[in-house]
Amino acid sequence: MEALVYTFLLVSTLGIIFFAIFFREPPKVPTKKIK
C-alpha cells in the first residue's frame, strides 16, 4: 500500500504547486477566460 501513499503525496504536492503558481498571478484575468 506504499504506492498509494506515494501517489497521494505526489498529487498533493502538485496541487499545492499549481495553486501557488495560480494565486501568484494577479487576479486581473477573469476566471471565465480559462474555460
Swiss-Prot record:
As for membrane topology, the entry says: Single-pass membrane protein
InterPro entries with a match to the protein in the record: PSII_PsbT, PSII_PsbT_sf
Q: Which UniProt keywords apply?
A: Chloroplast, Membrane, Photosynthesis, Photosystem II, Plastid, Thylakoid, Transmembrane, Transmembrane helix
User: What biological-process GO terms show up in the record?
Assistant: photosynthesis
Localization (cell): Plastid, Chloroplast thylakoid membrane
Q: Kindly list the GO CC terms recorded for this protein.
A: chloroplast thylakoid membrane; photosystem II reaction center
This molecule's function is given as:
Found at the monomer-monomer interface of the photosystem II (PS II) dimer, plays a role in assembly and dimerization of PSII. PSII is a light-driven water plastoquinone oxidoreductase, using light energy to abstract electrons from H(2)O, generating a proton gradient subsequently used for ATP formation.
What interactions and quaternary structure are annotated? PSII is composed of 1 copy each of membrane proteins PsbA, PsbB, PsbC, PsbD, PsbE, PsbF, PsbH, PsbI, PsbJ, PsbK, PsbL, PsbM, PsbT, PsbY, PsbZ, Psb30/Ycf12, at least 3 peripheral proteins of the oxygen-evolving complex and a large number of cofactors. It forms dimeric complexes.
PANTHER family, per this entry? PHOTOSYSTEM II REACTION CENTER PROTEIN T, PTHR36411
Q: What is this protein called?
A: Photosystem II reaction center protein T
Organism ancestry: Eukaryota, Viridiplantae, Streptophyta, Embryophyta, Tracheophyta
Question: Gene encoding it?
Answer: psbT
